[in-house]
Amino acid sequence: MLSASQRSQSVQTTQPIPPENAAAAQSVSACERRFEHPHRLMLGLYLGAFLGMLSETSMNIALPALCDEFGITTGTAQWMVVGYMLAIGIVLPCVGLLLKWVKAKTLVIVALCCFLVGAVVSAASPVFALVLAGRILQGVGTGIVLPSMYAAIMRVFPPAQIGAANGVAGLVIMFAPVIGPTLAGLLIGMFSWRAIFALFAVVSVAAIACTAVFFVTPIETTRPRIDVISVVASVIGFGCLVAGVSLVSDMGASGVVIGLLVVGVLVLAFYVWRQLHLESPLLDLKILGLRSFTVPALMVTCSFACTLAIMYIAPQELQRGLGFDATTAGLLMLAGGVVNAICSFGAGRLFDRFGAVPLVRLGALLAIVGSVLFLMIGVGTVPAFFVLAHVVFMIGIPFMQQSAQSAALKGLPHHFAADGSTILNTMQQVVGAVGTAIATCLLMAGQAAGTAGESAAQGFVTGSRHGYIFGLVLIVIALLLSFLHREQR
């Protein structure tokens, strides 16, 4: 809305507007005024996205402390990671629909409030179940904020500035994994794991304030029909599948686990069938029939799942296997995070010049070397060797992931762009959750098999190697998939 002085000046300096053009002119005027400082307008969303990625990458280093305080197993503690990613994966497909029903500003503030409440609950909870409940609330908030940020960028910035705006958003998101493990380690060393959630709460309040003051709703609410059956099926299907895989580490091949897996697979099969037959599906899964999208999307998913699995195991191995405290473990992971951010920034420019295939293969080879170095880590390994393995691995991953992601989205027709991005992000989060759960199962199985006659530290190192082998297999799969991809010039 225009202020009183602005309305007065408008009346004095403009000619009468024809009635049929009044609404359009008013809308254009509002847009010009509102979007005069687009980065300031987006500040709350930038903070929210940073917070979501910081939360996703900083919790791994706190898992040993949670196990010690609550007396839980590694398999139970993994839910702090898996539950968060599962919540994101379930919410993501629904955000596009929510933005058409609820004003973007309202939706983002609600999402950030969910994150704030979740952070406070996790920080203050005396029992693990409530810590996990707060963590899942944080995942819901992140799952809404991330796609909302990119949707707002497409409408707030003029076409000539969208590339630069996406670059700013990318830098914000890349900065979080760089400092996440190190910051979490420092907070645990100085205070406790609860300080991590206290920090999340403070940043949440800042993001809410910036959104309330600066953000406007750039997305029109059209209120299309909601296919409730699809929404429910996606929640049940993804939830049962990830829960079933995650419970294997503690319950084995029990009836509950098998039942969850069967229900998850059947419901997801129904979900896919329904999306393919609806006139207005929740997600247009016909995109998966495009080889130019599906092959690089699978490469992205494999590399993302590998990264999460290895980054889930590595900080725990530093503490439980090599005997470092949380602060030292966080500092040892800083170099790899910095290198990853730098390479992520450069991978996009190299993609424009060389295409996806050579970069994916180069990245896969580097990641394979890094994974093999991880396999060579033992109880007496010097810190410098771990840093070397981590740095080599983290150099390779962005060349794989960024290049394959660009290739997947580049060849999509314009009308598939939004669904393609959502499908890709959903695949990453859900498969990442499953991959982390599988890595946990392998970690615990290897730990149990190698404990006889070994110290607890050696047993954890033995179990970690099983998880690293799983990550190595995923990288090899991504490398083989690169031979099926055809570049689009």
Can you say where each PLM-predicted feature lies in the sequence?
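Membrane-embedded alpha-helical segments in integral membrane proteins
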Residues: E56, N60, P64, V117-S122, ...
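Peri-membrane helix termini and adjoining interfacial loops of integral membrane proteins
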Residues: P18-A22, A207, G446-S455
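C-terminal membrane-cytosol helix-exit motif in multi-pass small-molecule transporters
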Residues: A201-E220, V235-L247, V263-L278, A478-R486
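MFS-fold secondary transporters
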Residues: G118-A123, Q138, M154, T211, ...
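Membrane-interface helix caps and helix-loop-helix hairpins in membrane proteins
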Residues: F128, I219-P224, L247-A253, V379-G380
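Cytoplasmic helix-loop-helix junction between adjacent transmembrane helices
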Residues: L137-L171
